[in-house]
Amino acid sequence: MAKKVVAQVRLQLEAGKATPAPPVGPALGQRGVNLMEFCKKFNAATADKAGMIIPVIITVYEDRSFTFITKTPPASFLLKKAAKLNSGSQEPKRKIVGKVTREQIKEIAEIKKEDLNANDIEAAMKIIEGTAKSMGIEVVD
């Protein structure tokens, strides 16, 4: 018989640097999950992606065991990295804060394709371009 799911927790954590401190501690501690066990498993699973922000979905079961699924880094994080920015524009449609090339958009779309609701790379690129525009990043050829 399958275990009963008690909760699903979504977090965005830096790869290889999860600690029992907030945000991990409060989110998982109140559900009775062994924090150190989660941190060790997450850090081991994401050690090769150091420096990136990794979204993770943690499924907590009735017996306090857990499983987790890591996703690809957020498009906004990858765009900021490609454009060498610390943050997006405060006024996205009016103020341009950086530029990315179509080639960089394609690379980001390749990375994100498995998590995006897109059938082909062109559709994934359009999604990433929309994210770039909403951040005040200009797409150039």
Swiss-Prot record:
Entry comment on modification after translation: One or more lysine residues are methylated.
Alphabetical UniProt keywords: Methylation, Ribonucleoprotein, Ribosomal protein, RNA-binding, rRNA-binding
GO terms assigned for molecular function: large ribosomal subunit rRNA binding; structural constituent of ribosome
Transmembrane segments: none
InterPro entries named in the record: Ribosomal_uL11, Ribosomal_uL11_bac-typ, Ribosomal_uL11_C, Ribosomal_uL11_C_sf, Ribosomal_uL11_CS, Ribosomal_uL11_N, Ribosomal_uL11_N_sf
BP GO annotations: translation
Keyword Ligase: no
GO cellular component: cytosolic large ribosomal subunit
Function noted in UniProt: Forms part of the ribosomal stalk which helps the ribosome interact with GTP-bound translation factors.
Family listed: Belongs to the universal ribosomal protein uL11 family.
NCBIfam families: L11_bact
Assembly mode: Part of the ribosomal stalk of the 50S ribosomal subunit. Interacts with L10 and the large rRNA to form the base of the stalk. L10 forms an elongated spine to which L12 dimers bind in a sequential fashion forming a multimeric L10(L12)X complex.
Protein's UniProt name: Large ribosomal subunit protein uL11
Biological source species: Thermosipho melanesiensis (strain DSM 12029 / CIP 104789 / BI429)
The organism's taxonomic lineage, starting at the top: Bacteria, Thermotogati, Thermotogota, Thermotogae, Thermotogales
